């Protein structure tokens, strides 16, 4: 039997542990933890779940519809009229050459899925969408489809006709190598990176963009996106030549593409001695305007350059572009008009693709700075807008594309207020990055 003193000590210890247990239980209830249950999100992420589930359903719908076709979905064929384009471009009339292109009359305008061969610059995005959706959901059928459509692109490892082989192969084979690595996938990426390096001119310090047009050596701001393939090739091989070439291109582009306010020209063409031939646009409102997707390409590219090099000049460039974008947006939901200098009217098309690219870039940028909360919050606003009924398609509609209301190339009368496969890609990538930063498990939403 316990002595009276020992009994008192025992009672006090028992009371202490009972109080401690009750306190721990209260804290567990207060913060939503349970020893038998997985961690649950503290906020309402219904919009996030809806975006992921819609994307998975739309991609499965598209896979079923296109079957074994090797032509990959890019957009929906839409109509337009030249008067509308003139108003958007502040022109009294379009040139004869433009007018000849601006006549896509078709019985199925607005509903016909627009598919292209593997040599189209967007060919890597549909397989990439499948890979990202698989990573987000763990759905094995999406992985199987991703493998199938990625394999279609295997001949591109030998293609040298465009800088866009970075888009085409990194978004497809790059994701494949992350999620289902194989020696053949790795070698295809390295071969493609070598071909991209073959477009680099050391006198100019840039990778050539297009092989068409009257320009001498065109470089477009979009080209900043192809540098990720070269960074990846350095990681795969241990050879810094790919990375150093990419950073040289980025420095030259920083010097010549950007204005004092950190807005970017779309196209800079160089003379053979490295001097600038001309600065202009091919997809923006005017040579002097700020084409929305072009600004997003620049933000994304310089964020990647800082991530890989830790060179502070690239961080400053990315932050200044981010500041420009957040300052100049005219819309309440932050999804930009197709050009930041476009007419501010209800009729002016938005560009959901620019919003998705910006969101993805800002999420990564938020992880590279000391206090990235403002970037993360702005990216969250963009993603919530894109995940709303105003932009996220209903399952079974929109010909299987995930997002609505993107603009491809308005001055060329191409893909205006329509879905685009690369809008879907960067939307899914942004959702994935958002979940990784917030440590959200899709299964527990």
Q: What function would you assign to each model-found segment?
A:
Residues 1, 31-34, 403:
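Intrinsic disorder/low-complexity segments
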Residues 8, 16-17, 36:
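Short, low-complexity interaction segments enriched in Ser/Thr/Pro/Gly
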Residues 11, 18-21:
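Positively charged n-region of N-terminal signal peptides that target proteins for export
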Residues 21-30:
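Sec-dependent N-terminal signal peptides
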Residues 39-445:
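Glycan-recognition and catalytic cores of secretory/periplasmic carbohydrate-active enzymes
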